[in-house]
Swiss-Prot record:
Part of the 30S ribosomal subunit. Forms a tight complex with proteins S10 and S14. Belongs to the universal ribosomal protein uS3 family. It comes from Francisella tularensis subsp. holarctica (strain LVS). One of its GO terms (biological process) is translation. This is Small ribosomal subunit protein uS3. Binds the lower part of the 30S subunit head. Binds mRNA in the 70S ribosome, positioning it for translation. One of its GO terms (molecular function) is rRNA binding. GO terms for cellular component: cytosolic small ribosomal subunit. Gene3D superfamilies: 3.30.300.20, Ribosomal protein S3, C-terminal domain. The keyword RNA-binding applies. Keywords: Ribonucleoprotein, Ribosomal protein, RNA-binding, rRNA-binding.
Amino acid sequence: MGQKVNPNGIRLGYIRDWRSTWYADSSRYATKLNEDIKVREFLHKKLAAAAVSKIQIERPAQNAKITIHTARPGIVIGKKGEDVEKLRAEVHKLMGIPVQINIEEVRKPEIDAKLVAESVAQQLEKRVMFRRAMKKAMQAAMKSGAKGIKIMVSGRLGGAEIARSEWARDGRVPLQTFRADVDYATAEALTTYGVIGVKVWIYKGEILPGQIAEKKNNKKGAK
């Protein structure tokens, strides 16, 4: 029986970049890793209403640079940037080093796996039928330019006595092609019957080696 590896992890260093980019020796590595986990947990909790897709952390010298990818940048920034300044001060307390926070807008939340998974989970919490929630998310993704999408929900679906898994797919989702740009994310719906797990795979097309090199060069130029 075949086992499915995490689509993000298997593509790291090939078409995916790490979400924490820093170096530490063995004595400091665990401390910095724990800091990253705490910062991410804090930001996801604090910005629950801001539709946060991912958080990237860089540590140049004795500083930290945090990039928040969100579908609602206005909620994160606040009036005249007040909210982002408060956020920077709170993260500075957690990390103990100067922190710079950048906000990047997610232009198409319909084809962002994390945001789609959270949207389906929120609908399940509001007692929307799981098939309807899945169908709506898939239609929106395909309209926004996705080449394929697969959604799986697991748990006591519709309040059933026995937990089960149901999935639906539209288009194609190649999991074994490394150059295939497959975005993968999970979310949890906390319902009165228990926890329902949501998994989302979104295929956006292929990224060829030339495009990867170009992307890396553009990144270096921006720095």
